[in-house]
């Protein structure tokens, strides 16, 4: 939650470093308690959202809790990308997994230093609280996020999860290297389309035997410092307001000492009429969450599922939420920031620099993990590697030259990505390499619009994601194609003409990680500007006549995503 004008509080002076919460000799609990005691109710409310603003009068910098690290630092530009989570789990190698997570945590520290504000503040995807691992059990291939998990086995999920958490959090007795987050708690395995309204009723046997073991293991053995509560309801009660899950199991039975953050938009699910509608009003929903174990709200701005801090203040003033509960949550949150060393001058991670990401040593670790994850490849008769270079090689399939296939989801931007096709060409430079997409992943193959079909194309680039203001550059273009840098917000608009090679029905989309729109013949063919969960594969159709030229306009934007985006 960002600082909202009615609740913003500005002060002129910052406190001396000698105040108790700045004293590293005191315990994190003592320091956090001292800090929270100095805040007004309005200031407290502002600190309970994922984008916590600075409190200048207390010398507290802003902090954004939202950071992704499923298989490497994600959405923060160039970083080492490891295999997707389900591939790493296939190794059954807990030592390798812990070492991998240690590399990832080093890169998180480097990325934090790279963009750290002078006062120590951090921005979106530049913090040290990592929202991984995903411990949900993957038993239905129709769930589109199964690749984020460690598979179908609760025991394996727990062991791999523990290793990942230990690698992320480190082994220093006083400070966390980063904070890991076991998610999504609990009983959450799709379907995606109904995730904000789903109400699940697992049997006690399934709950204890399938859905909870990995979470229990990462709390009791892995000592994970954070838990993310789910969108869905369990037994009629929203996950983020579910005392059975968050108080009975998590804290009473398992002894969890950390904080609970909502999945993004899940707090709004508690009260929204188009979601779980568990309470009648937003203040009542906020109260239900905090009183039953939730400590931090992640708001989903893209889908309008935010929970403004005014609702927290209103809940307290109406008697729905006690200020003591607010203080309890804030103390947990500030203990976490203190244990990350965000207020202290000397840390055990001082040897990490802002350049310690995307290094050759880290690339080697990623390659080793990728090799270890190939457990279903049977090299019968020692066919590979080829004894001699073939004269002709056919590379067929929609994943052969796909960047998306390499990085999966929740990914960083590799500095030197190599697709299957790239690798074969490099390995056999003198061979004749034939490539065909063949089919699409979920339908006919999608082909890029050829340069020859486009005429007079010009592109305008903007230094913001909304095509706002004057363009930073305008130039001729051969195609509606862009390779955006991976660590900035920008947008572009292409205009020109399109000539159809044949008469027929054509489908168009833009292979964007974020939003896009396509107009043909001044008709809006596809509009995915407000895409909620990128990437989208939505396309639109229009009938075109052979040889006729049509006005074409394509718009797209990125928010820290990678490039290689084009009109299909």
Regions found by a protein language model. Give the residues of each.
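Glycoside hydrolase catalytic-domain context in secreted enzymes
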Residues: 11-492, 499, 535, 543-546
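Solvent-exposed beta-strand/loop surfaces of large extracellular or lumenal domains
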Residues: 520-540
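Bacterial N-terminal signal peptides
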Residues: 1-6
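Short beta-strand-plus-loop segments that form exposed binding edges in beta-rich domains
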Residues: 553-563
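A general secondary-structure signal for short beta-strands and their flanking turns/coil
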Residues: 491-493, 503, 513, 537, ...
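Aromatic-lined ligand-binding clefts that engage carbohydrates, nucleic acids, or primary amines
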Residues: 498-518, 552
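A mature extracytoplasmic/lumenal domain signature
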Residues: 69, 437-439, 512-514, 522-524, ...
């Amino acid at each position: 939650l960002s600082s909202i004008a009615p609740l913003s509080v500005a002060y002129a002076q910052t406190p001396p470093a000698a105040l108790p919460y700045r004293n590293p000799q005191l315990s994190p609990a003592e320091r956090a308690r001292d800090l929270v005691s100095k805040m007004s109710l309005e200031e407290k409310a502002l600190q309970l959202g994922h984008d916590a603003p600075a409190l200048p009068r207390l010398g507290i910098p802003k902090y954004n809790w939202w950071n992704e690290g499923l298989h490497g630092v994600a959405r923060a530009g160039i970083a080492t990308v490891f295999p997707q989570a389900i591939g790493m789990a296939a190794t059954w190698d807990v030592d390798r997994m812990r070492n991998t997570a240690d590399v990832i945590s080093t890169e998180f520290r480097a990325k934090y230093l790279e963009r750290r504000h002078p006062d120590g503040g951090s921005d979106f995807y530049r913090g040290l609280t990592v929202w991984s691992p995903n411990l949900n059990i993957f038993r239905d291939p129709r769930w589109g996020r199964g690749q984020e998990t460690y598979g179908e086995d609760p025991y394996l999920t727990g062991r791999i999860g523990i290793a990942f958490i230990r690698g992320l959090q480190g082994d220093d007795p006083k400070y966390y290297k980063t904070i890991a987050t076991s998610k999504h708690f609990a009983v959450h395995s799709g379907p995606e389309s109904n995730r904000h309204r789903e109400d699940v009723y697992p049997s006690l046997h399934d709950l204890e035997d399938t859905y909870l073991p990995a979470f229990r293991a990462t709390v009791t053995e892995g000592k994970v410092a954070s838990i993310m509560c789910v969108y869905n309801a369990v037994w009629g009660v929203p996950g983020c307001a579910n005392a059975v899950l968050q108080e009975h199991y998590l804290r009473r039975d398992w002894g969890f000492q950390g904080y609970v953050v909502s999945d993004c938009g899940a707090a709004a699910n508690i009260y929204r009429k188009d979601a779980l509608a568990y309470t009648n009003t937003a203040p009542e929903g906020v109260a239900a969450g905090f009183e039953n174990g939730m400590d931090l709200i992640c708001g989903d701005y893209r889908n309008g599922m935010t929970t403004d801090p005014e609702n927290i203040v209103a809940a307290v003033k109406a008697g729905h939420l006690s200020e003591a509960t607010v203080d309890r949550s804030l103390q947990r949150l500030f203990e976490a920031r203190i244990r990350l060393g965000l207020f202290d001058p000397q840390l055990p991670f001082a040897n990490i620099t802002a350049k310690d990401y995307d290094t050759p040593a880290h690339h080697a670790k990623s390659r080793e993990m990728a090799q270890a994850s190939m457990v279903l490849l049977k090299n019968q008769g020692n066919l590979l590697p080829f004894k001699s270079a073939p004269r002709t090689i056919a590379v067929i399939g929609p994943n052969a030259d796909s960047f998306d296939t390499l990085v999966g989801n929740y990914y960083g931007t590799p500095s030197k990505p190599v697709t299957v096709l790239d690798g074969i060409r490099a390995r056999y430079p003198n061979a004749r390499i034939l490539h065909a997409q063949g089919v699409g992943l979920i339908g006919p193959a999608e082909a890029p619009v050829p340069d020859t079909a486009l005429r007079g194309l010009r592109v305008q680039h903007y230094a913001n994601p909304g095509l706002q203001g004057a363009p930073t550059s305008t130039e001729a273009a051969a195609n509606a194609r862009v390779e955006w840098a991976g660590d900035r917000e920008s947008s572009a608009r292409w205009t020109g003409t399109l000539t159809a090679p044949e008469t027929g029905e054509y489908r168009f989309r833009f292979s964007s990680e974020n939003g896009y729109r396509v107009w043909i013949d001044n008709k809006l063919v596809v509009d995915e500007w407000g895409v909620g969960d990128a990437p989208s594969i939505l396309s639109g159709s229009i009938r075109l006549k052979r040889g006729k030229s049509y006005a074409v306009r394509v718009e797209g934007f990125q928010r820290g995503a990678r490039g290689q985006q084009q009109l299909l």
